[in-house]
């Protein structure tokens, strides 16, 4: 009996083992693996396989007991599936509602160091960090659906991070905690719904399982990752305040690294994506590594780019405490919606760009307009038709100027004048003209200035007023420019550069004629047609520059001929008078506060006794002889009288004087 019982037990064990071996052969595993399985492993793997067939009835081949119908497409599908697992940077796993791992691919050994046989059929809670148990339970729990579905099965997307046990070396595994590695799991929760009593609202659902793909995050050492053209790296503190940025960020977002340093990453993220970034930041601080969702990083000039970041917490090698955050960022798109400005930084940047462009264009225009205004008014040098006589009374009395029209405009341009005289600013306190090449027998300098003239100027004048750069012609120009305009006496010159307007009297009555004359603010003079006017004096030759007095009047009739004769007699008397420039100098007369406007003739300004004060010394009688008289017709046209020569400077030379 004992032998029979021993033999029966042995036979039973052998049959049992044989059945287990036969069952192991039915498992979709290589024979090398199934031949070494124990009974517990075979039962565990078989149970998991049966659950998988319930979840994917059509994905695991034909049912037992049915003839296999293999075709060419089936063999291709099997080969394709094996290739997909090899190319997948991760592993596939299926977890039941109770946490049992129904299936996991053999590629899990590459990332975790754990074999497929060891993991299949066991609870996933045994291989994840204790702090992640609650999260895993929440993932496997389906809340009542918000909308009733007519479909019997539907799926709910899931994306989460787990710290799974890893037995690989820490150097190659990229471990963040002792023995655990962060795995990014993304997939869906499959739910099956059942109808009760054919009522849509009386239904229940069953959680079939979680299907997900686990992916390892990039290692924390940035030297182990090759940065491509669409990637950049930054290092930040634990509160995401940027400390260092790669130079590639300029090409991808427009920001310079110094523009983002010491600023938090939240400041440059689209407002709708800050919640996702905050959630990823929380997971990063808790689990040590995270992969963000796609979020929008604002561009410098407007719009945004889509970015996904792989961040890791770096620990201090000595204290093992969290030190900083290193993130590798993938820019997935070009700048979108460049015209949208969603932050104050973008607005200020665009304004600075516009102001920079405006400043650049303005500076270019200013550089072009900074050329002297007088260069536009340059005229050809006019040759003197009369040979110069050194130190003669003719040249001292002539008062030659380079441009007639500049009596009431800016000082004329001289070929030998220094640049500082040509390029005086509008706010300058200097009021002088360039020196003229006249052979004066004495040193000439700037004209004396009265206090009432520069009442609105600065009290102290520059030292340049003491330099010998003026001329007697400037004395008359200065005093005559400061006199108020009068409707009875106007200035007229026979030059195209004379200030002009449709109403000359209106131009001469400006509130500040000195400033208008200094800066050339008065428009050019346009003389009337020759048929409608004539000059009081015969004009000088076109090539002769003069400072003569001209006044436009209508054509003279017979009644006005005596008046012209009186003017000729006055000129003759002036020519016989001694030159004013040779007279001894006298103290400058003090001009009253308000002076009437006088004629432009220089000899009348300094010689005649009139509104300017006392007459010029040395010619008291000549001043009285300047008053116009009406000589008879015989005296005006005597045949033996010397024929006078008229010059534009109102100086008459008779018999070669």
Swiss-Prot record:
One of its GO terms (biological process) is lung development. Pfam families: bHLH_HIF1A (PF23171), PAS (PF00989), PAS_3 (PF08447), SIM_C (PF06621). Residues 369-381 have a biased composition (Basic residues). InterPro entries: bHLH_dom (IPR011598), HLH_DNA-bd_sf (IPR036638), PAC (IPR001610), PAS (IPR000014), PAS-like_dom_sf (IPR035965), PAS_fold (IPR013767), PAS_fold_3 (IPR013655), SIM_C (IPR010578). A motif (Nuclear localization signal) lies at residues 367-386. The keyword Electron transport does not apply. Gene3D superfamilies: Helix-loop-helix DNA-binding domain, PAS domain. Residues 218-288 form the PAC domain. Residues 1-53 form the bHLH domain. Transcripts were detected in high levels in kidney followed by skeletal muscle and lung. Low levels were found in testis, brain and heart. In early fetal development it is found in CNS, developing kidney, tongue epithelium and cartilage primordia. Residues 77-147, 218-288 form the PAS domain. Keywords: Developmental protein, Differentiation, DNA-binding, Neurogenesis, Nucleus, Repeat, Transcription, Transcription regulation. Its main location: nucleus. It comes from the Eukaryota. Residues 336-657 form the Single-minded C-terminal domain. The keyword Hydrolase does not apply. Efficient DNA binding requires dimerization with another bHLH protein. Heterodimer of SIM2 and ARNT. Transcription factor that may be a master gene of CNS development in cooperation with Arnt. It may have pleiotropic effects in the tissues expressed during development. This is Single-minded homolog 2. The lineage of its organism: Eukaryota, Metazoa, Chordata, Craniata, Vertebrata.
């Amino acid at each position: 009996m004992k032998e029979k019982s021993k033999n029966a037990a042995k036979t039973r064990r052998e049959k049992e083992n044989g059945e287990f071996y036969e069952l192991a052969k039915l498992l979709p595993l290589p024979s090398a693996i199934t031949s070494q399985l124990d009974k517990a492993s075979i039962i565990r793997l078989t149970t998991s396989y049966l659950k998988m067939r319930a979840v994917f009835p059509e994905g695991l081949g034909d049912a037992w007991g049915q003839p296999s119908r293999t075709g060419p497409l089936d063999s291709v599908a099997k080969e394709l599936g094996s290739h997909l697992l090899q190319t997948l940077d991760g592993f596939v796993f299926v977890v039941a509602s109770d946490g049992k791992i129904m299936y996991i691919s053999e590629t899990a050994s590459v990332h975790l160091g754990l074999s497929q046989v060891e993991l299949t059929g066991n609870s996933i809670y045994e291989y994840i960090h204790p702090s992640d148990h609650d999260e895993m339970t929440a993932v496997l729990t389906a809340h009542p659906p918000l909308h009733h579905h007519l479909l019997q099965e539907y799926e709910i997307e899931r994306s989460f991070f787990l710290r799974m046990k890893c037995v690989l070396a820490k150097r190659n595994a990229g471990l963040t905690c002792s023995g655990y590695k962060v795995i990014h799991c993304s997939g869906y929760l499959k739910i099956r719904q059942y109808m009760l009593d054919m009522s849509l609202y009386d239904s229940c659902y069953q959680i079939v399982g979680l299907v997900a793909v686990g992916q390892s995050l990039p290692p924390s050492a940035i030297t182990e990752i090759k940065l491509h053209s669409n990637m950049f790296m930054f290092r930040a503190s634990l509160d995401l305040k940027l400390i260092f940025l790669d130079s590639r960020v300029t090409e991808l977002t427009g920001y310079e690294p110094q523009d983002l340093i010491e600023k938090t990453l939240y400041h440059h993220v689209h407002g709708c994506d800050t919640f996702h970034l905050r959630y990823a930041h929380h997971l990063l601080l808790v689990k040590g590594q995270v992969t963000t969702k796609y979020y929008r990083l604002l561009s410098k000039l407007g719009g945004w780019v889509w970015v996904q970041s792989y961040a890791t917490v770096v620990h201090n090698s000595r204290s093992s405490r969290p030190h900083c955050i290193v993130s590798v960022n993938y820019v997935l798109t070009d700048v979108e919606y460049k015209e949208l400005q969603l932050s104050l930084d973008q607005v200020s940047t665009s304004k600075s760009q516009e102001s920079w462009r405006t400043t650049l264009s303005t500076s270019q225009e200013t550089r072009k307009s900074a050329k002297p205004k007088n260069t536009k008014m340059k005229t050809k040098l006019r040759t003197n038709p009369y040979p110069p006589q050194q130190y003669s009374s003719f040249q001292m009395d002539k008062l030659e100027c380079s441009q007639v029209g500049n009596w009431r405009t800016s000082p004329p341009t001289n070929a030998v004048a220094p640049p500082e005289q040509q390029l005086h600013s509008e706010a300058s306190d200097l009021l002088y003209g360039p020196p003229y090449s006249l052979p004066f027998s004495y040193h000439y300098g700037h004209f004396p200035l009265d206090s009432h003239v520069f009442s609105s100027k600065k009290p102290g004048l520059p030292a340049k007023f003491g330099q010998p750069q003026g001329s007697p012609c400037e004395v008359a120009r200065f005093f005559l420019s400061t006199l108020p305009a009068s409707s009875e006496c106007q200035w007229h010159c026979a030059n195209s550069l004379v200030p002009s307007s449709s109403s000359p009297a209106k131009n001469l009555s400006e509130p500040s004629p000195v400033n208008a004359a200094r800066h050339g603010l008065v428009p050019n003079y346009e003389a009337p047609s020759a048929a409608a006017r004539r000059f009081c004096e015969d004009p000088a030759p076109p090539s002769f520059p003069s400072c003569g007095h001209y006044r436009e009047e209508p054509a003279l009739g017979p009644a006005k001929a005596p008046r012209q004769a009186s003017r000729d007699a006055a000129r003759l008397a002036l020519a016989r008078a001694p030159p004013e420039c040779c007279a001894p100098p006298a103290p400058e007369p003090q001009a009253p506060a308000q002076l009437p406007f006088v004629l432009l003739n220089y000899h009348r300004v300094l010689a005649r006794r009139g509104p300017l004060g006392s007459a010029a010394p040395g010619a008291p009688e000549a001043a009285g002889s300047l008053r116009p008289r009406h000589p008879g017709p015989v005296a005006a046209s005597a045949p033996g009288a010397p024929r006078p020569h008229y010059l534009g400077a109102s100086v008459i030379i008779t018999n070669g004087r």
